[in-house]
């Protein structure tokens, strides 16, 4: 069953993997969630012009036993949201907005996407990923486009606390590195959409060579998750014009920073010493 209070976010994370008829149902629910809590199965099916069996299958696809359980959980979520549905609309940038208003809207957008990420994350899987990373001989982060930039940022942070880590955004380098991984290594694939062919193929190669594989994505059932041992789902709550800079990067960085914090937790002294050691060699090169 989907996490309580998380029905709408779960639908969003599964959206790209849904069939055409399921997307039709999802669109209506995301647009008018109150419809489900106020109507019966037959009434909703008639409104959507789909069969009752199709609606029940949709509920099972997103993790519920049937329509009744789905309706109950969605009703609970709506009752506790306190009109939070308005928050996404309030982050849209309008032509009349001044710089302060835009700044406040971006602040709200960041808060929205982090809240959604916390709701979507399977924290047990996250903790397992941290355990695997602590034991890993090497860690490789793979991602193209903006996800590649995020991978480089994570590489920098992990290297500073003593991990053997690398990152790549070039597909040829990604494939070659993945082919050389072993069962002692961990491969992390970053793809917000989940449909990056290069990243999905890299994770497949890494898996075939025995590495532990992790996918960080917004799309729970997507190509990048197919060969992943662990799937970490990030949020995507953003306005139409906010794009990757707010939605994708903030959500991905939030998850990676959470992993970093858990890796350091309980080993603060060792992490601090290692970080200072790596910092010192950088400071030595600065112009005095």
UniProtKB/Swiss-Prot annotation:
Residue ranges: DNA binding: 41-60
Q: Which InterPro entries match?
A: Homeodomain-like_sf, HTH_RpiR, RpiR-like, RpiR-like_SIS, SIS_dom, SIS_dom_sf, WH-like_DNA-bd_sf
The UniProt record lists the keyword Isomerase: no
Look up the record and give one Gene Ontology term from the biological process aspect.
regulation of DNA-templated transcription
Q: Which residues form the HTH rpiR-type domain?
A: 5-81
Q: Which SUPFAM superfamilies match?
A: Homeodomain-like, SIS domain
**Entry keyword Hydrolase:** no
Listed Gene3D superfamilies: Glucose-6-phosphate isomerase like protein, domain 1, Winged helix-like DNA-binding domain superfamily/Winged helix DNA-binding domain
UniProt entry keywords in alphabetical sequence: DNA-binding, Transcription, Transcription regulation
Pfam families from the xrefs? HTH_6, SIS
Tell me where in this chain the SIS domain is found: 129-269
UniProt GO molecular function: carbohydrate derivative binding; DNA binding; DNA-binding transcription factor activity
Q: What is this protein called?
A: Uncharacterized HTH-type transcriptional regulator HI_0143
Q: Which organism is it from?
A: Haemophilus influenzae (strain ATCC 51907 / DSM 11121 / KW20 / Rd)
Question: Organism classification, top ranks?
Answer: Bacteria, Pseudomonadati, Pseudomonadota, Gammaproteobacteria, Pasteurellales
